[in-house]
């Protein structure tokens, strides 16, 4: 659940900072990596 909640905040940051900010974030946290891609698939 926390992963999905974070993913809701990330798209807003991604629009401001761009992919360079979003990419290193998921790269450093592997658990969030799965959660982010899972939520991304559910959202789209």
Curated annotation (Swiss-Prot):
It comes from the Bacteria. The keyword Lipid metabolism does not apply. Keywords: Leader peptide, Pyrimidine biosynthesis. It holds the Pfam family PyrBI_leader. The keyword DNA damage does not apply. NCBIfam families: PRK10224.1. This is pyr operon leader peptide. It comes from Shigella flexneri. The lineage of its organism: Bacteria, Pseudomonadati, Pseudomonadota, Gammaproteobacteria, Enterobacterales. The gene is pyrL.
């Amino acid at each position: 659940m926390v992963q999905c909640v974070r993913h809701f905040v990330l798209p807003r940051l991604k629009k401001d900072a761009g992919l360079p900010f979003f990419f290193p974030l998921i790269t450093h946290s592997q658990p969030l990596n799965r959660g982010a891609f899972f939520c991304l698939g559910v959202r789209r």
